[in-house]
C-alpha cells in the first residue's frame, strides 16, 4: 500500500504502526543489532560482541569513499555489510552497498552506484533491502543479492526511501511524504 503522510516524522509513523526502529543508538556514532555493538572512533569502526563486550574487529576504512551511513551495518560469519554514501546529487563511485571479509581483509563485492542512501538497510536471508533517491532523481527500493551485490529487483517510489523496517512478513518504508507497506 502507498499512503501520503503529510510530511510526517518517521518515528511518528513507526510508533502508530507499533514498530521499532532498527539499529538506532543513543549517539550518532554508536548503534547496535541483536549480536553486535558498533562504535565509530575517528575513522575506525569498533565492533563489540553484545553480552561480553569483547571487541572482535576494528575496521579502518581505506578511503573516505568507504563510509557507513550513520547507524547501520550487518555482520555475519566474518562478513561485514556496509555502504558508501555521499550527500548530494548522483556522482560516480558513491551510494553503494558492499561486503567485506574481515578475516581476510578483502572486499568481496560492491553494488552498483546509486543503489543506497537510505538511513538503513534490512537483511532478509540472501537479500538486502535498501533504497536510493534524491531530489530530481529516480527513487527506488532495491533488492540486492547478499552474496554477489547484484540488483535482483527494484520498486519505483514517489520519494526517496528514508527508513525501512521488516516485521511480520511486511516491509514498512517511510519516505519524506509517503509511507509504504509491502507484503514480503
Predicted regions located by residue number:
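Aromatic (tryptophan-biased) beta-strands that constitute blades/sheets of beta-rich domains
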Residues: 1-23, 54-64, 106-113, 140, ...
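Repeated scaffold domains used in trafficking and secretory/extracellular systems
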Residues: 10-11, 16-32, 63-76, 113-125, ...
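Residue position within the beta-strands of beta-propeller blades
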Residues: 39, 81-82, 130, 173
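Short, solvent-exposed loop/turn segments at conserved positions within beta-propeller repeat blades
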Residues: 39-41, 88-94, 133-138
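A short loop-to-beta-strand structural motif that recurs across blades of beta-propeller domains
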Residues: 44-46, 95-98, 140-142, 178-180
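Short loop/turn segments that connect beta-strands within beta-propeller blades
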Residues: 50-52, 101-104, 145-149, 184
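Eukaryotic tandem repeat interaction scaffolds
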Residues: 59-122
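Blade-level signature of beta-propeller repeat domains, shared across WD40, Kelch, NHL, RCC1
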Residues: 162-184
